[in-house]
């Protein structure tokens, strides 16, 4: 797409997506309708929230899942309250990820992290001796990265902004949970290609790899316009003139793909791409019936969770969410669940309200003010950090009557 046309198309609030973002066809089918919802990261001071359609389309050709409507990215990313550095689990993962990528290219000297957030991933690369660069449109996070000594551009990543790096080409390019945020996925990869050397490697990470298997619907919100499988990624990569050389899965964010992309075929010992394609086919990911069943399970899951939480309220449990995560807002809004409070360790979210359900967000110190004998049922909304959340709560409050409610893949209550 011509960049001027792309910029002109940004003058909208939201629009319908009529073509597959991976393979380009127009054979799309609505699979799941989560209703009209507010922007999942639009935490506010008890203000009225605009709502937008939140529906999931399936491509009948490459089986790429994608939103039926796309919201203007400026409404979501210019002021961003999700911060990577507040989770120790994520910091540990970034250390693993940086070392893992260097196994593919041990002589790398430069790295570009697209959508670098507060620079936490770049911190890991800097410790390993690499020259670190990043790009991110969030103006409120820009100084955090710069103050750590990283070279940062505050903007969206595209074929125009890459020239702010003075025609530099990078040994490693990382794009974690960002390709799924853009409707211009092909342009994104083509722009990456322009700043890759012949032996550079692009690592694209996408979450939701277990989304269908575990009946997860909370990761569907307006920021996530795409939900990749290996087949749809392979289609997109090849349309962009690149090669999908490898793929591996990690446990982060409840299960993620990491796609290893290059300008030419590398001599790798693994047959992971072929194997993953076969696994996905065996699991029914290339069959529309699987997705229709998934939608039905999502509706039933929402009803069951609402019923379970109401039963706990009837037993005089205080209902507290932990982690004011975007995914939690999809869950709460779709299920129409109200909690007493939500705890979050990110100061940028504290003393605000969640979008849609308008639940107050508080500091974890509130646990010290609640009578230790009063029963609390905790709902870890950032369930991808469940173990870390449970440990944090236990350190501040030790009550054997407290409950922890897990809801994917099925509802499970623990002490």
Feature locations, PLM:
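Conserved beta-strand signature within the Rossmann-like core of class I S-adenosyl-L-methionine
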Residues: 199-207, 403-406
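Short, glycine-/aromatic-enriched active-site segment of Class I SAM-dependent methyltransferases
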Residues: 202-226, 230-232
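Flexible, glycine-/basic-rich loop-and-beta segments that form/coincide
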Residues: 254-297
């Amino acid at each position: 797409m011509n960049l001027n046309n792309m910029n002109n198309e940004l003058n909208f609030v939201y629009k319908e997506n009529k073509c597959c973002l991976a393979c380009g066809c127009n054979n799309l089918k609505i699979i799941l309708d989560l209703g009209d919802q507010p922007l999942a990261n639009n935490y506010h001071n008890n203000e009225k929230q605009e709502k937008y359609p939140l529906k999931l389309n399936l491509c009948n050709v490459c089986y790429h899942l994608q939103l039926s409507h796309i919201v203007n990215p400026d409404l979501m990313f210019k002021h961003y309250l999700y911060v990577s550095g507040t989770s120790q689990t994520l910091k540990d993962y970034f250390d693993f990820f940086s070392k893992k990528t260097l196994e593919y290219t041990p002589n790398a000297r430069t790295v570009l992290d697209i959508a670098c957030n507060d620079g936490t991933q770049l911190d890991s690369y800097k410790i390993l001796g690499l020259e670190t660069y990043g790009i991110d449109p969030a103006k409120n996070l820009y100084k955090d990265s710069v103050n750590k000594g990283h070279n940062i551009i505050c903007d969206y990543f595209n074929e125009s902004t890459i020239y702010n790096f003075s025609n530099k080409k990078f040994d490693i390019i990382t794009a974690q949970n960002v390709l799924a945020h853009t409707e211009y996925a092909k342009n994104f990869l083509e722009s990456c290609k322009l700043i890759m050397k012949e032996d550079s490697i692009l690592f694209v990470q996408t979450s939701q790899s277990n989304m269908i298997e575990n009946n997860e619907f909370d990761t569907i919100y307006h920021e996530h316009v795409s939900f990749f499988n290996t087949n749809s990624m392979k289609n997109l990569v090849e349309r962009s003139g690149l090669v999908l050389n490898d793929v591996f899965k990690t446990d982060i964010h409840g299960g993620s793909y990491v796609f290893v992309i290059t300008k030419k075929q590398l001599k790798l010992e693994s047959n992971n791409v072929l194997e993953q394609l076969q696994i996905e086919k065996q699991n029914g990911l290339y069959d529309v019936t699987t997705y229709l069943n998934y939608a039905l399970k999502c509706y039933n899951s929402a009803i069951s969770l609402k019923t379970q939480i109401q039963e706990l309220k009837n037993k005089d449990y205080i209902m507290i969410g932990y982690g004011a995560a975007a995914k939690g807002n999809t869950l709460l809004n779709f299920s129409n669940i109200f909690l007493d409070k939500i705890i979050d360790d990110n100061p940028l979210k504290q003393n605000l309200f969640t979008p849609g359900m308008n639940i107050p967000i508080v500091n974890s110190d509130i646990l010290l003010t609640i009578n230790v004998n009063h029963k609390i049922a905790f709902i870890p909304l950032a369930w991808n950090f469940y173990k870390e959340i449970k440990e944090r709560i236990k350190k501040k409050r030790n009550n054997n009557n407290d409950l922890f409610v897990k809801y994917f893949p099925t509802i499970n209550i623990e002490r």
